[in-house]
């Protein structure tokens, strides 16, 4: 079954490939211009090429002549939740063609052997909020990066090894889920604790906030729904427990009166936000793969609700597009990934487990183009695997950040690489964009702002 393209949200389209570049060198404290002209001399230093890697997915030759059209970029004032909004659908964001590094700040403890940074930064108006690998939450001025407040939410009575969680902001509150099995509501202006809710188990993903409710998923596959004003539990849903899983977890997606919750078991369910009644359920764990790791069916990438179409992808190699209201499948594809798909107009962009950046048609899941990405720092020896975060569509380019210290820019129209950022450290989480600014958090615990 193929669903028609919903027409509820008006879109203005732009045709063709725009030759914009995302080539920026960041080394220590220095940053060069973004460039892309063929006649310019190359920057010094080691290059990691976009490989001619033929394993995996292929573009559909029958749609090779389809012109990729995108909505016009718009300025989003906020990136207040994981994925940008409660529905995780941000479309095409505005970002200048030549952003410069304007400031950087220390968010706290970075990723290491014991704890990892899992929280995306969130941006609301003139403030950026972050959380480090040990539940240290900070607020920074978005214009110059000065710290406004900082609060340590680590539970001193707990053993080492409890980390993860994330943050979301709504109105005058910041909501924090921690690996210490606590959900906090903080005053957005001061960091003062307003309420604390003790969860039944730790959390590895960020909360999502919508219509007076906080939605958060625990490590043992329960979704808690809390009142934003009091922290009181309104209802909860219990999924199938899973003993094996990936680091981190996906946040639910919310639109209208429906929440789509992903679990590490591969379950994806649509529930009514009022009382938790099930609208429909799917399982993304039944594609059999030769790779034993693919047996982990976890839905690690955030599900997306794009104009009443739910997009969900699992690590086990299955992607579904499902009607939000009826639960009817629009299409399914044998594609695995752990990053959030990015929806824009008639197309969907995603990074696969096999290190490919893919453009799909929204209406039927057919592949318009595929770009192989570097998979190892040392490709010849296949050592030091690269983990890619993203993509984000901003300023007519797809931006993906690597764990090896480079950020790539790729054309959304044909998949051709446009350039790279050479960071001094790898990206811990996917980049975020708000108010014409790009924000990156590194494994070393640095927040970098470019505009």
Tell me what each language-model feature is.
Residues 132, 162, 171, 178-179, ...:
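Structural signature of WD-repeat beta-propellers
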Residues 138, 184, 224, 269, ...:
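WD40 beta-propeller blade core
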């Amino acid at each position: 079954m193929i669903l028609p393209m919903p027409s509820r949200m008006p879109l203005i389209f732009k045709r063709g490939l725009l030759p914009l570049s995302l080539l920026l060198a960041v080394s220590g404290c220095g940053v060069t211009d973004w460039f892309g002209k063929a006649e310019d001399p190359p920057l010094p230093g080691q290059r990691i090429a976009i490989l001619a890697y033929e394993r995996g997915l292929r573009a559909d030759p029958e749609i090779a002549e389809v012109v990729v059209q995108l909505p016009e970029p718009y300025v989003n004032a906020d990136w207040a939740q994981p994925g940008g909004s409660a529905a995780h659908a941000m479309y095409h964001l505005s970002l200048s063609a030549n952003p410069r590094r304007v400031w950087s700040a220390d968010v706290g403890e970075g990723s290491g052997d014991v704890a990892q940074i899992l929280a995306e930064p969130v941006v609301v108006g003139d403030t950026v909020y972050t959380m480090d690998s040990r539940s240290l939450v900070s607020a920074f001025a978005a214009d110059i990066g000065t710290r406004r407040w900082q609060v340590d939410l680590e539970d001193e009575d707990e053993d080492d090894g409890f980390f993860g969680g994330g943050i979301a902001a709504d109105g005058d509150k910041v909501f924090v889920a921690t690996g210490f099995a606590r959900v906090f509501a903080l005053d957005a202006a001061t960091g003062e604790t307003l309420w604390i809710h003790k969860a039944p188990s730790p959390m590895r993903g960020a909360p999502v906030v919508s219509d007076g409710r906080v939605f958060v998923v625990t490590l043992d596959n329960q979704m808690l729904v809390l009142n934003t004003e009091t922290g009181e539990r309104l209802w909860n849903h219990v999924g199938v427990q899973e003993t094996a899983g990936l680091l981190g977890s996906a946040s639910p997606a919310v639109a209208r009166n429906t929440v789509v919750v992903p679990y590490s078991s591969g379950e994806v369910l649509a529930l009514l936000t009022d009382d938790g009644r099930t609208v429909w359920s799917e399982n993304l764990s039944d594609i059999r793969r030769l790779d034993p790791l693919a047996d982990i069916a976890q839905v690690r990438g955030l599900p997306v609700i794009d104009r009443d179409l739910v997009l969900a992808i699992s690590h086990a190699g299955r992607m579904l597009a499902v009607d939000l209201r009826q639960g009817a499948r629009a299409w399914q594809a044998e594609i695995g990934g752990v990053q959030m798909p990015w929806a824009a107009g008639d197309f969907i962009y995603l990074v696969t487990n096999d290190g490919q950046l893919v453009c799909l048609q929204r209406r039927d899941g057919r592949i318009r183009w595929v770009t192989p990405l570097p998979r190892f720092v040392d490709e010849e020896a296949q050592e030091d695997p690269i983990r890619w975060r993203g993509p984000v569509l901003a300023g007519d380019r797809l931006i993906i950040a690597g764990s090896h210290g480079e950020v790539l820019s790729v054309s959304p129209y044909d998949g051709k690489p446009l350039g790279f950022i050479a960071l001094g450290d790898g990206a811990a989480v996917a980049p975020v964009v708000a108010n014409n600014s790009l924000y990156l958090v590194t494994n070393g615990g640095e927040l970098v702002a470019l505009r």
